[in-house]
Amino acid sequence: MSESRLPHLSGTGDARMVDVSEKAVTARSATAAGRVLLSAECVAVLRDGTVPKGDALAVARIAGIQAAKKTPDLIPLCHPLFISGVDVVAELIDEGVEITATVKTTDRTGVEMEALTAVAVAGLAVIDMIKAIDRAAVISDVRVLTKSGGRRGDWSREDDS
């Protein structure tokens, strides 16, 4: 594999942290989304606000924000970034919870991993809050929806609204 295709690999195939010191500092953002699929009973409990452990959606939002800030501690080759904003939305839908996270920075590398981490950990927080009600909950479809800034410019997933 060429270095340009997988920049986290050295010429000999060893993992490395990419040197971004020569890259321009630019405004960047990324939005990711995912779902927690739940039973109808669990959705009803969430809708009624009677989850025994408390407000699952509020906990998910805070967990997602915290996760975005901790991404370089969790993903070994991610750069520590100056995150200027994180917005996590956790909405109840018929199938469970839809989670969306937008992360912004002005830095040398993008924030896709921070947005993905925010969504994944927010989903884990939902499961932690409702596991006594629905042991079969599933985190699903975690993906980047959009990214902006940087050398390659803006990108948007075509198969998502």
Question: Predicted regions: what is each one?
Answer:
Residues 1-57, 62-77, 83-161:
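C-terminal binding/interaction regions
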